[in-house]
Curated annotation (Swiss-Prot):
Segments in the Cytoplasmic topological domain: 551-566
S-palmitoyl cysteine lipid attachment residues: 555, 562, 565
Gene this protein is translated from: HA
Protein name (record): Hemagglutinin
Gene Ontology biological process: clathrin-dependent endocytosis of virus by host cell; fusion of virus membrane with host endosome membrane; fusion of virus membrane with host plasma membrane; viral budding from plasma membrane; virion attachment to host cell
Disulfide bond positions: 20-481, 58-290, 71-83, 106-151, 294-318, 488-492
Ranges of the Extracellular topological domain: 17-529
Subunit organization: Homotrimer of disulfide-linked HA1-HA2.
């Protein structure tokens, strides 16, 4: 009879009403890293590192780039005959120059402060070319004979289009004194040059005067250049060299030229009609008939992510460049479907006492599963889920806003005398980049740890909310579930979920069932104790009889000698 009562009690326990606290799980394979763990699978995650580009040069915010193709900036500005397509160019968003363009200074020489001029172009978006000293305004000098085979055009000798190489006329080179006043509202970019002959014979052949100079002055410039006559190896078939200069002439300022030979005079100047953020980008790509907000030398980036690892040099509204291969923010929970056990988390909620996530609960992150005589089902706790979603969304947006500063990094150029500065600049930029990469990676690791612990704490809080309501009307099963000592229908289950559970209403029924179950356990325990004692005594008696019989047999056949001493 006792066994029947015990069996009935066990069956009753199995069939008791239950409510469990759990969390959402899905088929996601997304993984994140935290301070403590690597490759943690989560239900939801957000990638914040852009890794793709389109491999094209695009318009920047609707404005096309100026792609110089085989021409250099110097070849474009001076007017290399092979760069005639760039004699007049529209507004540009940025300038694209190849690493080693073939059409630069066709007549060999140097461009003074060339890197500074390129820096000026990084703040300029449109030039308007204007004539300041017409070619036919040199009656005492030859303005059309200054050509060279080094600058061919259609198989004939030619020269830079925007400057005039002045030669002697009728064996005379009268001293030049010319001025130009900037009456425009915009700054003017003016270029001129000086010719350095190969020997004295070439000097007199071209300019008649053996000793010459070129003097240029403005309100901010005072320059006097003297030709350097020297024997040099040939480049492009020329032993002579040309040196070009530039200056910015402010409105209402005047530039004065004076020379008695070797002067390469300006014919055209560039009016800076629009300033703005631009850049000179080194790239061999062609225009891809596309539009972007961020351009790199290897392709355009169209992304709202705050970071990228595509190329350190960018122009436009760009994410920050980092050296990382992966930066993923956790937004969801640890993805641990049932039948999978994970390590215990900080609060022991998701990865601790709860066995696994529920793929059947799809309308929330945290919630309940109940079972009673009316059936079973899942119900999400939408209030805690919404609070968590809002909190994590705000945090992710805050992180992205902090990182997503409009950022551009354009390469800087240095001349041969500034290599140490260039090396120092590169080391500093690499150092800053390493620090920024480390900070970004550390921030992601820390925030992922906090997010997962935040979810653990929310599940634990939901569990405690139920535990505090039920008190001793149910018992904890240790797996996130509670087993009732009373009947709990769907209305009762709903009251637990919304926090209105009436403890006194069910306490008497729960007490009686609890005492009945405890009594059954005590009675069954007494039966087991009696059986245990009986079994022990019987076993000991049987063992003693066996030992006595063995001893008697051994004594009777002489195997064992028995002596009784008094």
């Amino acid at each position: 009879m006792e066994k029947i009562v015990l069996l009935f009690a066990i069956v009753s326990l199995v069939r008791s009403d239950q409510i469990c606290i759990g969390y959402h799980a899905n088929n996601s394979t997304k993984q994140v890293d935290t301070i403590m763990e690597k490759n943690v699978t989560v239900t939801h995650a957000q990638d914040i590192l852009e890794k793709t580009h389109n491999g094209k040069l695009c318009s920047l915010n609707g404005v096309k780039p100026l792609i110089l193709r085989d021409c250099s900036v110097a070849g474009w500005l001076l007017g290399n005959p092979m760069c005639d397509e760039f004699l007049n160019v529209p507004e540009w968003s940025y300038i694209v120059e190849k690493d080693n363009p073939v059409n630069g200074l066709c007549y060999p020489g140097d461009f003074n402060d060339y890197e500074e001029l390129k820096h000026l172009l990084s703040c300029t978006k449109h030039f308007e070319k204007i004539r300041i000293i017409p070619r036919d305004s040199w009656p005492n000098h030859e303005a059309s004979l200054g050509v060279s085979s080094a600058c061919p055009y259609n198989g004939r000798s030619s020269f830079f289009r925007n400057v005039v190489w002045l030669i002697k006329k009728n064996n005379a080179y009268p001293t030049i004194k010319r001025s130009y006043s900037n009456t425009n509202k915009e700054d003017l970019l003016i270029l001129w040059g000086i010719h350095h002959p190969n020997d004295a014979a070439e000097q007199t052949k071209l300019y008649q005067n053996p000793t010459t100079y070129v003097s240029v002055g403005t309100s901010t410039l005072n320059q006097r250049s003297i030709p350097k006559i020297a024997t040099r190896p040939e480049l492009n078939g020329q032993s002579g060299r040309m040196e070009f200069f530039w200056t910015i002439l402010k409105p209402s300022d005047t530039i004065n030229f004076e020379s008695n030979g070797n002067f390469i005079a300006p014919e055209y100047a560039y009016k800076i009609v629009k300033k703005g953020d631009s850049a000179i980008m080194k790239s061999g790509l062609e225009y891809g008939n596309c539009n972007t907000k961020c351009q790199t030398p290897i392709g355009a980036i169209n992304s709202s992510m705050p970071l990228h690892n595509i190329h350190p040099l960018t122009i436009g509204e760009c994410p920050k460049y980092v050296k990382s291969d992966r930066l993923v923010l956790a937004t969801g929970l640890r993805n641990t479907p049932q039948r999978k056990r994970k390590k215990r988390g900080l609060f022991g909620a998701i990865a601790g006492f709860i066995e696994g996530g529920w793929q059947g609960m799809v309308d929330g992150w945290y919630g309940y599963h109940h079972s009673n005589e009316q059936g079973s089902g899942y119900a999400a706790d939408k209030e805690s889920t919404q609070r968590a979603i809002d909190g994590i969304t705000n945090k992710v947006n805050s992180i992205i806003d902090k990182m997503n500063t409009q950022f551009e990094a354009v390469g800087k150029e240095f001349n041969n005398l500034e290599r140490r500065i260039e090396n120092l600049n590169k080391k500093m930029e690499d150092g800053f980049l390493d620090v920024w990469t480390y900070n970004a990676e550390l921030l992601v690791l820390m925030e992922n740890e906090r997010t997962l612990d935040f979810h653990d704490a929310n599940v634990k809080s939901l569990y405690d909310k139920v535990r505090l309501q039920l008190k001793d009307n149910a018992r904890e099963l240790g797996n996130g579930c509670f087993e009732f000592y009373h009947k709990c229908d769907n209305e009762c289950m709903e009251s637990i979920r919304n926090g209105t559970y009436n403890y006194p209403q069910y306490s008497e029924e729960a007490r009686l069932n609890r005492e009945e179950i405890s009594g059954v356990k005590l009675e069954s325990m007494g039966i087991y104790q009696i059986l245990s004692i009986y079994s022990t005594v019987a076993s000991s008696l049987a063992l003693a009889i066996m030992i006595a019989g063995l001893s008697f047999w051994m004594c009777s056949n002489g195997s064992l000698q028995c002596r009784i001493c008094i």
